[in-house]
Amino acid sequence: MTVVGAVLPELKLYGDPTFIVSTALATRDFQDVHHDRDKAVAQGSKDIFVNILTDTGLVQRYVTDWAGPSALIKSIGLRLGVPWYAYDTVTFSGEVTAVNDGLITVKVVGRNTLGDHVTATVELSMRDS
């Protein structure tokens, strides 16, 4: 599991409007582009879209679901790409890229129909059980 080149199982998540609005509100992000389709379109967007706080949480969930309850996230470096609009699915994939002195590095990519939505590097360690 924690060897360089280990591939994480894919995770597919569908972003319906309820998911997008509820995760924006749960992260206290009240920007209208995340919950008001008319205002998002008026600002040049195709539809409402997922916020970066949700993306960060989903990247963390993806890695910890794979690593298990002993995982301790040390850092997440994240870059956004194309938007994740309502009614699209993001597929998360990942690979272990380094293991050094108990620190595991995982590259994560979330892709949707428009391309790479999020690219992240996650560093984690495993707590002693």
From Swiss-Prot:
Molecular-function GO terms, alphabetical: lyase activity
Biological processes per GO annotation: cholesterol catabolic process
**What is the name of this protein?**
3-oxo-4,17-pregnadiene-20-carboxyl-CoA hydratase beta subunit
What is catalysed by this protein? 3-oxochola-4,17-dien-22-oyl-CoA + H2O = 17-hydroxy-3-oxochol-4-en-22-oyl-CoA; (2E)-octenoyl-CoA + H2O = 3-hydroxyoctanoyl-CoA; (2E)-decenoyl-CoA + H2O = 3-hydroxydecanoyl-CoA
- Free-text activity regulation comment from the record: In the absence of the Ltp2 aldolase, ChsH1/ChsH2 can hydrate only about 30% of the 3-OPDC-CoA substrate. Complete turnover requires the presence of Ltp2.
At the top level of its lineage, which domain of life is listed? Bacteria
Its EC number(s): 4.2.1.-
Record family assignment: Belongs to the thioester dehydratase family.
Keywords (A to Z) from UniProt: Cholesterol metabolism, Lipid metabolism, Lyase, Steroid metabolism, Sterol metabolism
Please tell me which top-level EC class this enzyme sits in. lyase
Question: Keyword DNA repair on this protein?
Answer: no
SUPFAM superfamilies reported for this sequence: Thioesterase/thiol ester dehydrase-isomerase
Its pathway is: Steroid metabolism; cholesterol degradation
Instruction: Please report the organism this UniProt entry assigns to the protein.
Output: Mycobacterium tuberculosis (strain ATCC 25618 / H37Rv)
Tell me the organism's taxonomic lineage: Bacteria, Bacillati, Actinomycetota, Actinomycetes, Mycobacteriales
